[in-house]
Amino acid sequence: LLNFYNTLKQLGFNPKHIVDIGANHGTWTREALQHFPDAYYTLLEPQSWLKDSMLDLLEKNDKINFYPVGAGEKNGSFNFTIVDRDDSCSFRYTKEEAEREGFKQIEIPVVALNDLLLDSELPTPDIIKIDAEGLDIEVLKGASNYFGKTEVFMVEAGVVNKVFSNSFLKLINFMDENNYRLFEITDLNRPFTPNVLWLVELVFVKKNGFLDSKIIS
């Protein structure tokens, strides 16, 4: 991730508005702030109780806005499953799956980014980061207004992971169809034994956009 941020700065990319979907405790935003301290930040996190871990950011920086909601393709209220780790809680589980595993479910509001930012006076997002525990494509569909406008999308994709619907292949094809090119891989996630490649974190940039045009083949 550090290499990617350094590349952005070397290419003269200066984002004015950054969206963090699945902000959790704000760790990703904290790192982004070190590189882009003057940007506006819009944070979405369905676990409203995690806001307390970000109060220091929210209280000292009025350019950071926090929304205690999930992001998806459409607006509504959906069952959110609470699991052992707060960074793995998800809208992905069915009622039956949650009951079988002994997990609690609560109903939480979900918004499409298209609607959340519809009347916003903030600049169009330059970077949209998505960590949606396997539902990244649904979130992207709800952010379709920004295809062709937002320069950078950062998303997760499953590799060996058969649970996530957003496989590497599906995500590459989806972004290609919407005129985005794979630009960087910022993380290779190997959390289990055997040490297989479970997830990757990918960066896509707009085809023929600012960043894509800077790379000379």
Predicted feature locations:
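Phosphate/nucleotide-binding beta-alpha loop and adjacent structural elements of enzyme active sites
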Residues: 1-217
